[in-house]
Amino acid sequence: MSAPSQARHIVNFITGNANKLGEVKAILEPAIQVENQALDLLEIQGTLEEVTLDKCRRAADLVQGPVLVEDTCLCFNALKGLPGPYIKWFMNSLGHEGLNNLLAAYEDKSAKAVCTFGYSAGPGHEPILFQGITDGKIVPPRGPPNFGWDAIFEYEGQTYAEMDKAEKNKISHRAKALAKLQEWFAKEMTA
């Protein structure tokens, strides 16, 4: 006799970034089924929380169902939190070397990687935010340069790019935020 199947949450993760999708699936599945849809959503300027809430509301309206969105910051302490939620544009314009050059005049190379996920059950449902933070420092690029700023963000002696994917998925800002999401979904399942 087979075990009864348990109901699983299904989330539609809104991203066009295959690396992010892979990490989210590796962390959440099989407990939460992750589907994917790439939508071109205009991002407002604001705090990370404002950007994530707005993106989540608009995605839920477009999809007409439950959505999961994510926004990431890389905050340089010497620059009072910049580039922050604008890291994507800084990275595209400056690259790894340019980001390092922003800190050339500063002794403080410390930084925070911040990930905020927004979940909405659908149109008209207020998004819920889940945030994870990892402290590290900015270093010259090490490791494969194929996932954003992973090659310049060092955590306990290794850049994210140098880490095994499974190891990174245990300690990263994204993993910490997703752990909070998983905890919330687990409570919802028993409610």
From Swiss-Prot:
Disulfide bonds: none annotated. Binds 1 divalent metal cation per subunit; can use either Mg(2+) or Mn(2+). It comes from the Eukaryota. It is an enzyme of class 3 (hydrolase). Its cofactor is Mg(2+); Mn(2+). It catalyses: ITP + H2O = IMP + diphosphate + H(+); dITP + H2O = dIMP + diphosphate + H(+); XTP + H2O = XMP + diphosphate + H(+). SUPFAM superfamilies: ITPase-like (SSF52972). Its EC number is 3.6.1.66. Coiled coil: none annotated. One of its GO terms (cellular component) is cytoplasm. Mg(2+) binds at E43. Belongs to the HAM1 NTPase family. Pyrophosphatase that hydrolyzes non-canonical purine nucleotides such as inosine triphosphate (ITP), deoxyinosine triphosphate (dITP) or xanthosine 5'-triphosphate (XTP) to their respective monophosphate derivatives. The enzyme does not distinguish between the deoxy- and ribose forms. Probably excludes non-canonical purines from RNA and DNA precursor pools, thus preventing their incorporation into RNA and DNA and avoiding chromosomal lesions. Homodimer. HAMAP family: HAM1_NTPase. This is Inosine triphosphate pyrophosphatase.
